[in-house]
């Protein structure tokens, strides 16, 4: 992986493939940069693709305190690497981040988002409870509990969560669980 330095000094890791107009892939929750990997070969036929690991994930650094503005600066640094403008594709909370980056005035040529989990009014109360419980779990160092909260919010049953806790993938999810707070910040109140 190659890296670019964001405005606050954080190293942001990315892989670059193909040639043509730049497309930056913005991954969602618990993604270390691998979520969009299957898109890269197709897009790279006609684009220069920047598939990156958002801060705190994969090989990218993480500088406290977290702020949504830092993630927008990360995308700005990638746009700089891409020559000054780019298309953005964001999945899930990465879609919310891509929209925030465009709204902040970054040089975004086009934007596409997939399954951004914005809430309707009926879910706002559930979201507030989730964010409060997530914040408490992470403050107490209970990454596994934070991951279970996320899975429950996404519709997993208690049995599914119990089974997931014994899977080989659980440790990887726990390693990224602190970034669930970052995704919550991207989605706002």
Model-inferred region functions:
Residues 3-61:
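Conserved HGGG/HGGXW glycine-rich cap/lid loop of the alpha/beta-hydrolase fold
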Residues 41, 50-89:
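Active-site loop/oxyanion-hole signature of alpha/beta-hydrolase fold enzymes
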Residues 85-122:
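Conserved hydrolase catalytic core segment
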Residues 117-126, 157-160:
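A short beta-to-alpha transition loop/helix N-cap that caps and shapes the active-site region
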Residues 138-139:
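Hydrophobic/aromatic side-chain positions at a characteristic register within alpha-helices
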Residues 143-149:
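Solenoid-repeat scaffolds in large eukaryotic assemblies
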Residues 154-170:
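Short, charge-rich amphipathic alpha-helical segments embedded
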Residues 168-189:
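Hydrophobic, aromatic-rich cap/lid helix
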């Amino acid at each position: 992986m190659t890296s670019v330095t964001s405005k606050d000094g954080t190293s942001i890791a990315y892989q670059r493939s193909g040639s043509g107009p730049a497309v930056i892939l913005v991954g969602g929750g618990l993604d270390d940069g691998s979520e969009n990997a299957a898109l890269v070969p197709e897009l790279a036929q006609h684009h220069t693709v920047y598939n990156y690991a958002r801060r705190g994930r994969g090989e990218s650094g993480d500088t406290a305190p977290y702020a949504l503005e830092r993630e927008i600066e990360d995308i700005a640094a990638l746009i700089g690497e891409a020559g000054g403008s780019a298309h953005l594709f964001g999945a899930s909370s990465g879609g919310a981040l891509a929209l925030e980056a465009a709204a902040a005035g970054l040089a975004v040529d086009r934007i596409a988002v997939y399954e951004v989990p914005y809430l309707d009014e009926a879910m706002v109360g559930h979201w507030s409870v989730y964010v409060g419980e997530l914040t408490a779990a992470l403050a107490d160092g209970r990454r596994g509990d934070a991951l279970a909260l996320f899975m429950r919010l996404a519709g997993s049953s208690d049995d599914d969560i119990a089974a997931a806790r014994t899977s080989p993938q659980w440790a990887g999810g726990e390693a990224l669980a602190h970034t669930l707070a970052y995704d919550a910040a991207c989605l706002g109140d």
